[in-house]
């Protein structure tokens, strides 16, 4: 994974998709849990989690920023076996990471291995649809390191193959956030399959079988 040569570049690169306003939909699954943030970057999400949570990332620069925030982090290339034993975490948080790794299915298997029984996996992904590309062309053009693009159905199949069951799906609508239309976004979540193409990102919450 390569997000840029400096932590500042990483932060600038991920600003459009990092602390998504739609994070409020998945936060209840994270509250007061022992969490591993896979691809924790400069810790924007990690610092919102409980004190016994930790993160892993492949960038020394990013981890330096995390440590200045007193966050527990570890340097690791997540393309390999994760450096933890089985049944270690209650929740694994993986935001805008799977599209970058060499083998998404292997990472999902590793997440399953280190989750406790019925533990929760939260995956955040960009939506790379035609409509969104027209509106956010600058975003996608600045992300040549994306190796994969996932539809909701495609992601669901990967999760099923790696021993997860999907329990929730939420979309992120950037234009609605711009105009502070949170109630409209709440309503539109009921039609996520129909509206996937006009969202800019989405979350999937899955439980270990």
Q: Which residues make up each language-model segment?
A:
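S-adenosyl-L-methionine-dependent methyltransferase catalytic module, highlighting the catalytic core
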Residues: 2, 8, 12-21, 44, ...
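A short His-aromatic
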Residues: 96-100
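Conserved N-terminal segment of class I S-adenosyl-L-methionine
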Residues: 1-85, 91-95, 108, 169-172, ...
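Basic phosphate/pyrophosphate-binding loop/patch that engages nucleotide-derived ligands
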Residues: 113
């Amino acid at each position: 994974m390569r997000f840029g040569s400096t932590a500042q570049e990483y932060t600038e690169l991920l600003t459009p998709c990092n602390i998504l306003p739609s994070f409020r939909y998945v936060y209840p699954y994270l509250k007061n849990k022992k969490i591993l943030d896979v691809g924790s970057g400069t810790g924007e999400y990690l610092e919102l989690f409980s004190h016994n949570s930790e993160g892993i990332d492949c960038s020394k620069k990013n981890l330096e920023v995390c440590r200045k925030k007193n966050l527990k982090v570890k340097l690791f290339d997540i393309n390999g076996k994760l450096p933890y034993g089985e049944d270690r975490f209650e929740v694994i948080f993986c935001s805008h990471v799977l599209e970058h790794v060499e083998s998404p299915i292997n990472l999902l298997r590793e997440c399953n291995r280190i989750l406790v029984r019925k533990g929760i996996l939260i995956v955040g992904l960009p939506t790379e649809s035609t409509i969104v590309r027209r509106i956010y062309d600058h975003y996608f053009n600045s992300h040549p390191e994306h190796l994969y693009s996932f539809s909701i159905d495609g992601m669901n199949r990967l999760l099923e193959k790696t021993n997860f069951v999907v329990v929730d799906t939420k979309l992120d609508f950037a234009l609605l956030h711009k105009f502070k239309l949170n109630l409209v976004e709440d309503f539109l979540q009921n039609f996520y399959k129909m509206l996937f193409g006009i969202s800019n990102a989405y979350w999937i919450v899955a439980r270990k079988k």
